[in-house]
Amino acid sequence: MKIAILSRDGTLYSCRRLREAAQQRGHQVEILDPLSCYMNVSPVASSIHYKGRQLPHFDAVIPRIGSAITYYGTAALRQFELLGSYPLNESVAITRARDKLRSLQLLARQGIDLPLTGIAHSPDDTSDLIAMVGGAPLVVKLVEGTQGIGVVLAETRQAAESVIDAFRGLNAHILVQEYIAEAKGCDIRCLVVGNEVVAAIERRAKEGDFRSNLHRGGMATVAQISDEERAIAIKATQTLGLDVAGVDILRATRGPLVMEVNASPGLEGVETTTGVDIASRMIAWIERQATPEFCLKIGG
């Protein structure tokens, strides 16, 4: 197969591993910067051009699109879809997962347990918003934040009100969640490919922090997950229509709670911690799914 990887930086670990895995399985791979793709949208001769040439047909496309370029990145991916390429995560599913409010609404509708969550823009009654999630301590996040940026733990009601008021001054959407103290700064990242959790790690926040993101200095170890956690991770992935996802789960007293579903999970932390060849699992999934019938259907 001819496979395109959409990424702004082909030297990143995940891109390198996906290219290696695909080539080892006999596929041709090209890494394309989605922002350098430009498109001819036509009822008779739609095409995608890249650095002065028209791109050939690709059997499959692997989107590694950062949140900062979601709009144009998914637009480029959608053009590949319309031309009959199989996407490892459809553009509509990526957009759905990147919209934190929409994704939480969909997960909740499917009965997937979440931390108590309130979302607001300019709440007239900050006290009521805080009470909605059970009071302090609580976590205040910018809806557009990623990798732990724009996330604050407010230990008291007064601190929570101050943080919410400060964020409101940024003219930003605010997400307020209950603080799961019993998780003790840890979460579980389940890497889902298709209908299977292929690997799971426990991420522990560095001392003095509560954010477990590896980009923030968190530590990772292999996680043993329960059947319930496994089922929830798969259900969350399928609810958002994703083929591949990193599902972040908090272990609360009342059971596992889904914190976030990442549509473009990094492979480095999970592969190096667990030793699982996730990249090859992803390519194998493409091989099973990128049938002519599927590509004809998604191409419209």
Swiss-Prot record:
Binding annotation for Mg(2+) 1: D248, E260
SUPFAM superfamilies in the record: Glutathione synthetase ATP-binding domain-like
Cofactor, how bound (note): Binds 2 magnesium or manganese ions per subunit.
Keyword ATP-binding: yes
Residues annotated for Mn(2+) 1 binding in this entry: D248, E260
Cofactor(s) demanded: Mg(2+); Mn(2+)
InterPro entries: ATP-grasp (IPR011761), ATP-grasp_RimK-type (IPR013651), ATP_grasp_subdomain_1 (IPR013815), RimK (IPR023533), Rimk_N (IPR041107), Rp_bS6_RimK/Lys_biosynth_LsyX (IPR004666)
PROSITE patterns: ATP_GRASP (PS50975)
Pfam families, A to Z: RimK (PF08443), Rimk_N (PF18030)
E.C. numbers: 6.3.2.-
Domain ATP-grasp intervals: 104-287
GO molecular function: ATP binding; metal ion binding; ribosomal S6-glutamic acid ligase activity
Binding sites annotated in the UniProt record for Mn(2+) 2: E260, N262
GO biological process entries: protein modification process; SOS response; translation
Keyword annotations: ATP-binding, Ligase, Magnesium, Manganese, Metal-binding, Nucleotide-binding, Protein biosynthesis
Record-linked HAMAP family: RimK
Family: Belongs to the RimK family.
UniProt cross-references to PANTHER family, sorted A to Z: RIBOSOMAL PROTEIN BS6--L-GLUTAMATE LIGASE, RIBOSOMAL PROTEIN S6 MODIFICATION PROTEIN
Protein name: Probable alpha-L-glutamate ligase
